[in-house]
């Protein structure tokens, strides 16, 4: 489980990225890099870290499911992820 402060920081960053997304896109298309540099650092989507939506774990993140391998395995065994079943060959 990640620290609550890290999870809160991620939520704040996501809100900031969403807030400035349109402005950032127009400035980038115009080539106005000076104005882009004036925007908050955390408004850049590159600075976001993929984290598990359940417990905030930053490593071993699976993009397709939005969770770490640990939570994925746990929920898959319980049958709580639609379309996922244990492989057998």
UniProtKB/Swiss-Prot annotation:
Q: What Gene Ontology cellular-component terms does the record carry?
A: cytoplasm; small ribosomal subunit
A biological process (GO) of this protein is:
translation
Q: Which InterPro entries match?
A: Ribosomal_uS14, Ribosomal_uS14_bac/plastid, Ribosomal_uS14_sf
GO MF terms held by the record = rRNA binding; structural constituent of ribosome
TM region(s), chain numbering: none
The answer, when asked if Ribonucleoprotein is one of the entry's keywords, is yes
Origin superkingdom = Bacteria
Q: Does the keyword rRNA-binding apply?
A: yes
Enumerate the UniProt keywords alphabetically.
Answer: Ribonucleoprotein, Ribosomal protein, RNA-binding, rRNA-binding
What assembly does the database describe for this protein? Part of the 30S ribosomal subunit. Contacts proteins S3 and S10.
Per its database record, what is this protein's job? Answer: Binds 16S rRNA, required for the assembly of 30S particles and may also be responsible for determining the conformation of the 16S rRNA at the A site.
Q: Which PANTHER family match?
A: 30S RIBOSOMAL PROTEIN S14, SMALL RIBOSOMAL SUBUNIT PROTEIN US14M
Q: Which family does it belong to?
A: Belongs to the universal ribosomal protein uS14 family.
Q: What is this protein called?
A: Small ribosomal subunit protein uS14
């Amino acid at each position: 489980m990640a620290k609550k402060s890290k999870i809160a920081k991620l939520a704040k960053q996501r809100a900031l990225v969403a807030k400035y997304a349109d402005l950032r896109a127009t400035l980038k298309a115009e080539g106005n890099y000076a104005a882009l540099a004036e925007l908050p650092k955390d408004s850049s989507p590159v600075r976001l870290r993929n984290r598990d939506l359940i417990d905030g774990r930053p490593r071993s993140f699976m993009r397709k499911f939005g969770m770490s391998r640990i939570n994925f395995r746990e929920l898959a065994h319980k049958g709580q992820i639609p379309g996922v079943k244990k492989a057998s060959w």
